[in-house]
């Protein structure tokens, strides 16, 4: 988690969360239903986000800025991202799963405790995280290997 403030930079999930339920208060439940989450067409969401970024850039006189989308949610929707951000360059920063999965599970536990307030089945939460993000990685790999995929680089 990080500091929040009205004038501070924020992750893309806030602007994208206007269109799809990827905010922490809802997404921690949706990980339990990957078939639902993976079926969403978020092309319109990315178009809306692109427009918001363009507005921010124009307002600051920095139209040529590069933007970084860092949420792991983008793994699921690379095919839609590619449709909207046609000149994007994807740099996929790989973290060791033995570090990243516990980190995600801890984050999702915090969300569940904040919004559900009940006892959390940690074993079930761990299984859900492993299954969901494993499927997300496979989907992203497939999307980036597809004909016509954007230029991308893997960084470890």
Summary of predicted features, one role per range:
Residues 1-67:
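PAPS-dependent sulfation machinery
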Residues 39-65, 71-156:
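PAPS-dependent sulfotransferase catalytic domain
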